[in-house]
A protein has these predicted regions:
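Gly/Ala-rich beta-loop-alpha elbow adjacent to hydrolase catalytic centers
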Residues: 18-23, 27
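Short, proline-enriched alpha-helix->beta-strand connector loops that line the catalytic pocket
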Residues: 121-126, 148-151
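Active-site nucleophile elbow and catalytic-triad environment of alpha/beta-hydrolase enzymes
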Residues: 99-120
Length: 185
């Protein structure tokens, strides 16, 4: 959150925050910044006040392809390499998948268990992309979160990395958020 706030503080104008996966929880909190005018959730979690990502993960059984492993002794979460392509990014090439696996950043489990204190989508326009072939976050979870928050929903056929496999369709949603934000000024 602190790094996101620094970036937002340094912007000259209005900001559209885009979050993917657990990054949806980040934009849900960071979106309270006064420069943020809209939120775009791309195959992302959208918790409410007091909720966690883990809460939502537990609302629907995981796909058999899902390869998220339990945290290690340091609290770091990894994805099972054998399930990575099918469970995370089945609609991109195996070469791209192998590169993504090798270059993934560190993710601490506390990101799944930290509750939201103030959900920005309660006060700001929100847009949600449901990745209909997502094996990491069940599309049913994405739809449930987005519907209860009155988020404008766009469904796109693709895996959890919909922003890579369907970049034009995802960009169209982000552009729509920006255009609508500029109209409401």
């Amino acid at each position: 959150m602190a790094a996101t706030k620094v970036v937002l503080d340094n912007q000259d104008g209005p900001v559209i925050l885009v979050g993917h996966s657990w990054g949806g929880a980040v934009i849900t909190e960071a979106g309270n910044h006064p420069k943020v005018v809209a939120l775009v959730y791309v195959a992302a979690f959208q918790p409410d006040n007091g909720e966690t990502v883990l809460h939502w993960l537990q609302t629907f059984p995981p796909a058999p392809e899902n390869g998220v492993l339990p945290p290690d002794a340091k609290g770091i979460v990894y994805y099972d390499k054998a399930k990575y392509h099918a469970g995370f990014c089945a609609d991109i090439s195996k070469e791209e998948s192998d590169f993504m696996y090798a270059s993934q950043g560190t993710f601490y489990a506390k990101g799944f268990t930290t509750p939201i204190t103030r959900a920005a989508w309660r006060d700001k326009p929100a847009y949600g992309v449901v990745a209909t072939e997502d094996k990491s976050i069940a599309p049913e979870i994405e739809r449930s979160m987005y519907k209860r928050s009155n988020t404008k929903i766009t469904e796109i056929k693709g895996s959890h990395v919909i922003y890579i496999s369907q970049p034009k369709a995802v960009a169209k949603v982000i552009i729509e958020a920006a255009v609508n934000a500029s109209k409401s000024k």
